[in-house]
Amino acid sequence: MPDGRASTRDYMKHTGAVGVLALDEQGRVLLVRQYRHPVRHRLWEMPAGLLDVPGENPLHAAQRELWEEAHHKAGDWRVLIDVYPTSGGSDEAIRVFLARDLAEADGEKFAAEGEELDMEVRRFPLDDVVRAALAGDLHNGALVAGAMALKAALADGALDTLRPADAPWPARPF
């Protein structure tokens, strides 16, 4: 413990994850809808995935997830936010990237399997995503946090001052 006393605590170890809030020129974000068995619902989320490829840095993982889940690529990448979504029970850390200058990816689409088989991909105006989050219609924590952060960065004119995509990440050094 911070004061030097010993304590026993159970928590889940987690590899960490990345998410991609992909923003197009019309102010829309690219989201995916997929079934999530632990909550038994289809949820709207940003393209995201685990840091489960040995040696892969977070930016490359984010680029891979954007391609696999939405068959898109981006020319401009920034760090939007870093979060611990369940810090009371897990060491999970998520880095959410902002991706801009979007284009459809070249080549064949990724061969989806499992929960990703019937994934739906759509673009929504960011303002609609924020309203849906505030109305209780969006439940993915990383998406809600990322959308609110993006809305704030846009309001402040701060997109170009966001951290570079390769910024240090103390929670998951790479």
Language-model regions: role of each:
Residues 18-19, 50-139, 160-174:
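Unchanged
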